[in-house]
Amino acid sequence: MSTPTTSGSAAKPTRPARSSSLATRSCSNSGSLTSFQAMVELKQKILTSISKLADRDTYQIAVEDLEKTIQSLTPETLPMFLNCLYDSCSDPKPAVKKECLHLLSYVCSLHCDSTAAHLTKIIAQIVKRLKDSDSGVRDACRDTIGALSGIYLKGKEEGTNTGSASLAVGLFVKPLFEAMGEQNKVVQSGASMCMARMVESAASPPVTSFQKLCPRICKLLSNSSFLAKASLLPVVSSLSQVGAIAPQSLESLLESIHDCLGSTDWVTRKAAAETLTALASHSSGLIKEKTDSTITVLETCRFDKIKPVRESVTEALQLWKKISGKYVDGASDDSKLSASEQLGSEKNGEKRSNLADLMKKEASDGSTLSPDSASKGKGCFPEKAVGLLKKKAPVLSDKDFNPEFFQRLERRQSVEVVVPRRCKNNDEEESGLDDLNAMGSSNRLKNTQADDKQVKGRFDGNGSQARTSGDDKAGVVNGKETPGHHAPVSNTDNQSEGSFTSNRGNWSAIQRQLLQLERQQTNLMNMLQEFIGGSHDSMVTLEGRVRGLERIVEDMARDLSISSGRRANLTAGFGKYNSFANYPTGKYNGRAPGERGSQTDGAMRGRMWNSDMADDWFIPPHAASRNGQAGPRRSPRSEQYENEHMGNGRRGWDNKASGTIRFGEGPSARSVWQASKDEATLEAIRVAGEDGAVPRPTRVAVAPEAEAMGDDDNEGQERDPIWVSWSNAMHSLRVGDIDAAYAEVLCAGDQHLVIKLMDKTGPSLDQMSNEIANEALNFISQFLLDHSLYDICLSWSQQLLELVLQDGADTFGVPMELKTEILYNLQDACSTMDPPEDWEGPAPEQLVVQLASVWEIDLQQFDK
């Protein structure tokens, strides 16, 4: 019984053990749950900070938070942080990608031992980012590779470290060479830059491992499908800087670089030259025995058309020559060349001095010319030879002179003899010299009319030089023959003088014939010009006379028409401006019927007034008002004149002709034809022709028919005041004073004269004073309601609007009453009449609205 008891008592303590294991398990589960939550919170914090990198405002804060997080990482949280950076490297924002790459290098620098196991994946992620289109991201990849190289490529290859160093280098170069194998120039270039930075940034470069890169680099440089040779060549420069150029690969490497020097891409050529410079600077011991081929290639490339390439090639060439020992020899060669050039120039100078001495000697002997005479005279040798010598002057500096050639050239055409001076010993010698001077003077006078090819004699002040003309006696002075002067050239002188004489005669005859032809041609041209000028003048004169005759006949026909109209209907209205507007033909008029209303310019500012319109100024007084009302501004003088002449018509010759011509009848065609033969009419025609179609508004002061019929009483008659006003206005127009012309017509107070002048000058408000402009506007406001004057008023209203818009509402100081009247009448005319068909200006309604707007007048008050 004791055994069960014992066993039962022994089994009881096992129950607390089960409960303790359960408690431990629950504690571990709660701890793992807490750590998992902490990991989740940390990841969320990291992702939040990374997302803040995309915003410039929160960028710096996010960087600081991430750096603090990196400093607090543990081996357990490191993979999670790296995965967050891997995922963020695919962010579309370049700023996020660049900062994540920098953070990778920062993590590796702080946790190099923990990240060594993740180095393969880190480098793969960096190489993957080389495909990015943003160059800033690729530069960040290069910097990150350089930072990692400085961290992990520290150990030297000594003893057992060789395998680990080679393994570390392999971790870097394997993904980079794989990227270089892609047919993408951007990726190839980025991988090459990363490899160059890796070699440069290695703290303790593993030379043996780097030397293994040379064969693969040579293979890529020789491969035509590799596109980024300009980026791969700096890798060779970096290997040369760290002393990692393998001697067995040097020859193939140089051949590849030589091929790159002949590339069509100037960036590749420049990179190849810089690589050769780096090899000469850092690997001179290796290349000392292999410089000839490289120097030859550089010599062929030193004149590259791209300046940066030329500079790089020149620098490399100097270094390679210096290594080969040819640089000093080159300098000595240059010095020898300069010395030889100097020696050659000295020799040429001596030869030139010898030639000058020879020419002086020959000049003293008298057989040839002196240098002065050779430079001045035209007959010493041909002009072609002189031109040839001038053209070849620069070439002669490097060649020997040929005195014999110049002697031959000068003796061929030399015809001058230099006679030495002699002292005047006695009277006989003086007389001999006088004879010689006289002979030379006669010869010179004979040759004064020769052309430039003739030989001219020269004499000094004492008569020491004379020309020989083939006579042996010309060389004899004072009964003695001058030895050695004329004898060698006497035959040549005879032949030359004979040929020159014949040539001179031929040239003189040709010259005389040419001068005669030129004079005849000049005379013919003068005669032709005179004939053309006379014909033109005659045509102009005839045209002027015909125009004058047409105007006179037109005036006669107009007067006949007026008289016929009075007989038919004394109170009938006139046409556009006068009854002649309906004349059946425009043959004798200077323009076609109805031309007055044609307005090609909407503003009509500054329109030239027609000369023909200056003559038909007369408007019957019974048509004074177009609206059936009397004119408001008729002066007493005009009313008195109208009362005096209303019964018998406006013209003074109607009163004179009342005894012979019945009322309402004009002169018959026969009487007009007979009157045209009168002296006065012929004189008028003659004067009209001399005027050359110049406007003569005073021509119709007295009817030409009355002048032609010999009404001498008209000469003593007092001149018509209306005619005087119109005559003065036309005179003002001719001198360009439009304001005075309108002042004269407005003072006369005759509406018809105002209408005629407005039509003649066109809108001219800009050339009037304020007072005259207001008077003209007063007439325009009343003419607006006349259908026949509507086009004139529209053009003047348009100019008024332009001036008001330009100078302001107070232009001309128009009173408010006149403004209101103009707007009211213009609005009324717009509602009742249509603008002319040829009107090209703005619509009349627009004129009303714009004028009312500028003048600040409410148009609605007119409706009320």
UniProtKB/Swiss-Prot annotation:
Q: Where is the composition biased (Polar residues)?
A: 17-26, 439-448, 489-504
For this UniProt record, the keywords arranged alphabetically read as follows: Coiled coil, Cytoplasm, Cytoskeleton, Microtubule, Phosphoprotein, Repeat
List of residues that carry Phosphoserine: S414
List every stretch annotated Disordered.
1-26, 329-353, 426-504, 615-670
Which GO MF terms are attached to this record? microtubule binding
User: What GO CC terms are in its UniProt record?
Assistant: cortical microtubule, transverse to long axis
- Composition bias (Basic and acidic residues) maps to 449-459, 636-654
Do you know which Gene3D superfamilies this protein is assigned to? Answer: Leucine-rich Repeat Variant (1.25.10.10)
Q: What does a knockout show? A: Right-handed twisting of petioles. Enhanced twisting when associated with SP2L disruption.
One GO biological process term is: circumnutation
Superkingdom of this entry's organism? Eukaryota
Tissue-by-tissue expression: Expressed in roots, hypocotyls, stems, flowers, siliques, inflorescences, petioles, cotyledons, and leaves. Particularly present in root tips and shoot meristems.
Q: Where is this protein found?
A: Cytoplasm, Cytoskeleton
Positions of the HEAT repeats? 76-113, 117-154, 167-204, 208-245, 248-285
Which portions of this protein are annotated as coiled-coil regions? Answer: 508-561
Q: Which Pfam families did the record assign?
A: TOR1L1_C, TOR1L1_N
> Quaternary structure per UniProt?
Interacts with WAV3.
Protein purpose: Plant-specific microtubule-associated protein (MAP) that regulates the orientation of cortical microtubules and the direction of organ growth. Determines microtubule organization by modulating microtubule severing.
Q: Mind telling me what this protein is named?
A: Microtubule-associated protein TORTIFOLIA1
Species of origin reads Arabidopsis thaliana
